[in-house]
Structures are given as C-alpha cells and as structure tokens.
Amino acid sequence: MNILEYAPIACQSWQVTVVGAGNVGRTLAQRLVQQNVANVVLLDIVPGLPQGIALDLMAAQSVEEYDSKIIGTNEYEATAGSDVVVITAGLPRRPGMSRDDLLGKNANIVAQGAREALRYSPNAILIVVTNPLDVMTYLAWKVTGLPSQRVMGMAGVLDSARLKAFIAMKLGACPSDINTLVLGGHGDLMLPLPRYCTVSGVPITELIPPQTIEELVERTRNGGAEIAALLQTGTAYYAPASSAAVMVESILRNQSRILPAATYLDGAYGLKDIFLGVPCRLGCRGVEDILEVQLTPEEKAALHLSAEAVRLNIDVALAMVSDG
C-alpha cells in the first residue's frame, strides 16, 4: 500500500465547548484534551485569550502526545455541534465573599452563555460550574428550555473530593481508598454525611473521633473560602476543573458513574422544582437516575434547609435576567 494514498476511516469524535477561559475553564480544557476525553472548543469574550490558550495547549500536545484537539474562539458559531457544553464563565469570588454574593454579577453571564451555546448545539448536555452553583444551574435550565436530565451542576463531586482530601490527610490514607458523600447546595449549608464515608469499607466513624469528624465537616463547608483566603487574588480551580472533567467523561463514555451533582428534583428527597446536589447516575443521556439515600430526620431537615436557601435566590436570579 502506498502510504501517501491512505485515507483513514472517519470515527466518532466527541466535542466539548467550554464557555469561559478563566482559570477553571482553561484548566478544564487542559484536563479534557490531555486525557483524550474529547476535542475542545474554548470560548471567551476577551479577544485573543482563548486562542492563545488553545495554541499553547496544542504546542504541549507534541510533548505529551495526546490526540485531542483544541481551538479557541470568541464566536459561538465555532462551537456548533458540541456534545457537552460546560459553563464556567463568570466572576470568581474574592476573600470574604460568599458564593451568593456573586448572584447579581453572574446571572446574566450564565443566561447569555447558555442560550448562545445551546442555540448552536441544541442536542448538547449542559454542565454549569459558575457560582452560586445551584441557582445558576436552575437559571440555565430555565433559559434554555432543555429537558431537566440534560442539565446539571458541578458541585457535589468537588465537595465530596474536598472531604475525601481532608480525611486522607488526617488518617494518612490513600485518597482512592476513601469514599465520601456530600449532599445539598454548594454553600455553607451543604450536608456532608460522615456515616456514609468509608476508608476501604470501614466507616470513618470507627476511625476518627466525633469531634474531629465535625471539624473535617466544617472545613469541607469552608473549603472554597479557605483556598480563596490563602490565594488572596483568586479562588480554587484545579479541583473544580478535575471534578467537571470526571462528569464530562462519565457522560461521553457512557460510564454510568454514580456521582453527586446538582440535579433537578421532582419529588426525590421530598423536594420539587429545584436543582440540588444529590447522587445520580451520569451517562450518555445525562442524568439517567437519581439515587435516594436514607436520611435521618435531622439530615432530611438539614437538606431541606439547604434547599430553601437555594430557592430564595432562584427567584432573585430569574428577576435579574428578566429585568436585563
């Protein structure tokens, strides 16, 4: 065979659009292409920014020998035909800010980004990363009109990962041997569940004193604020990007992994018409199943309190977009 005449057969090639080329967006793009999860279109409104990042990552390709491609663009038309859209655009919080403080600043950014991206990729699955996470996910669902199973928010994977990291550091254990579960909104009222946390199958309640467990739980709730205070000029982005990448991979490769995500609830856990962090099965259709874990009356009350905090901000966000 003459090698010059060889024409490869066209194969399935996934495409992910990442809206926002800030720290989280660019790191997510890097994770996806370096792990050969998908080709990436990185979009940002700043001229030259996504193009420069994409060029740098394509140069890295020759060093690390991954196959996925990335392009940078300022135009939504270039994102057409994406299988997954991830919204990371928005202002990050600064030291002393809560995630809810970002509501007014990010509502219109998320609404516009979701509308435009889905206009060119109407069959895509939508993942929201922008804070305040649960509210922004609900908002993106409303403005796009997508089926609820095709919209989700990245928070539970991140919150559970932070709790896992703190347990690993406390016990000197391997993080991959640890399983954790955090429910609720991505904020101060999130609900870590220590009794569902294990190390190689052993409940952490048998390994760590109750007071220390409570300290780890509280540190998990404040994990993002702790990092923002240390960085002073920014907030976390490595772990958020890795968490979003895990969700994208489970969807595109139809892995059906059970991961905690901000998911639309229509009766599960006694909650309706809200996006909140719960364990769910992620596959090629998006959220394929919601798992209801057994909660004590106290845990259920705490979950509903977290939901009410999210619900209060949903109406505010919808009004902001409507007024805009």
UniProtKB/Swiss-Prot annotation:
<feature type="binding site">
    <location>
        <position position="44"/>
    </location>
    <ligand>
        <name>NAD(+)</name>
    </ligand>
</feature>
<keyword id="KW-0816">Tricarboxylic acid cycle</keyword>
<keyword id="KW-0560">Oxidoreductase</keyword>
<comment type="function">
    <text>Catalyzes the reversible oxidation of malate to oxaloacetate.</text>
</comment>
<dbReference type="Pfam" id="PF02866">
    <property type="entry name" value="Ldh_1_C"/>
</dbReference>
<feature type="binding site">
    <location>
        <position position="131"/>
    </location>
    <ligand>
        <name>substrate</name>
    </ligand>
</feature>
<feature type="active site" description="Proton acceptor">
    <location>
        <position position="186"/>
    </location>
</feature>
<dbReference type="Pfam" id="PF00056">
    <property type="entry name" value="Ldh_1_N"/>
</dbReference>
<dbReference type="GO" id="GO:0030060">
    <property type="term" value="F:L-malate dehydrogenase (NAD+) activity"/>
</dbReference>
<dbReference type="GO" id="GO:0006099">
    <property type="term" value="P:tricarboxylic acid cycle"/>
</dbReference>
<feature type="binding site">
    <location>
        <begin position="129"/>
        <end position="131"/>
    </location>
    <ligand>
        <name>NAD(+)</name>
    </ligand>
</feature>
<dbReference type="InterPro" id="IPR001557">
    <property type="entry name" value="L-lactate/malate_DH"/>
</dbReference>
<keyword id="KW-0520">NAD</keyword>
<dbReference type="InterPro" id="IPR036291">
    <property type="entry name" value="NAD(P)-bd_dom_sf"/>
</dbReference>
<feature type="binding site">
    <location>
        <position position="162"/>
    </location>
    <ligand>
        <name>substrate</name>
    </ligand>
</feature>
<protein>
    <recommendedName>
        <fullName>Malate dehydrogenase</fullName>
        <ecNumber>1.1.1.37</ecNumber>
    </recommendedName>
</protein>
<dbReference type="GO" id="GO:0019752">
    <property type="term" value="P:carboxylic acid metabolic process"/>
</dbReference>
<feature type="binding site">
    <location>
        <begin position="20"/>
        <end position="25"/>
    </location>
    <ligand>
        <name>NAD(+)</name>
    </ligand>
</feature>
<dbReference type="InterPro" id="IPR011275">
    <property type="entry name" value="Malate_DH_type3"/>
</dbReference>
<dbReference type="InterPro" id="IPR015955">
    <property type="entry name" value="Lactate_DH/Glyco_Ohase_4_C"/>
</dbReference>
<dbReference type="InterPro" id="IPR022383">
    <property type="entry name" value="Lactate/malate_DH_C"/>
</dbReference>
<comment type="similarity">
    <text>Belongs to the LDH/MDH superfamily. MDH type 3 family.</text>
</comment>
<feature type="binding site">
    <location>
        <position position="93"/>
    </location>
    <ligand>
        <name>substrate</name>
    </ligand>
</feature>
<feature type="binding site">
    <location>
        <position position="99"/>
    </location>
    <ligand>
        <name>substrate</name>
    </ligand>
</feature>
<dbReference type="InterPro" id="IPR001236">
    <property type="entry name" value="Lactate/malate_DH_N"/>
</dbReference>
<feature type="binding site">
    <location>
        <position position="106"/>
    </location>
    <ligand>
        <name>NAD(+)</name>
    </ligand>
</feature>
<dbReference type="GO" id="GO:0005737">
    <property type="term" value="C:cytoplasm"/>
</dbReference>
